[in-house]
Amino acid sequence: LHATVLETPTPHPQNGTHCLDYSLLYNVALLEYLKETGDKEVALDLWPVVVRQIEMALRQYSDDWIYDMQKKPIYWLVFDWKDNYDRQASMQGLTAFSLEKSYELAKMLGKEKEAGDWPRIAGQIKKAARKTFYDQKNGVIVSGPNRQVSYLSQVWMILSETLTAKEGAKAMATV
């Protein structure tokens, strides 16, 4: 999905602006839309976009299921506008969260076969996240080479259920 759509002189996307974290949230928003409205026709029309967002995100993962911040193409990740915020752990949690919500959408649309691997992949991403980003000694998620600790990284690992409720509560209290 394009990160920016301009209205003038006529509606058009701004080429070259793809915000991968927002693209994954599109899938979650479509699930919420379907749950709220029951509008299966629109959700089915937009289903190929959901699949594409997952495909784009998964291409950015290493063989050991860690989001690779240097893998081409390097997508714009917003999460927070803070310049020195390390986004790797947040992206890891968001991808797992989006995969699970996208699979829930697939089930509602009768598209389970197309999305059949998504729960397994989400599990692998979460397992890799715990191994790579979870600092057991301090009970927090760390991100990037400097092992940055942030509320946002904790939140995405909590939302994705990479951390248990107890671990999440401790992490948030520790940050």
Describe the function of each predicted region.
Residues 1-175:
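Active-site core of glycosidic bond-cleaving carbohydrate-active enzymes
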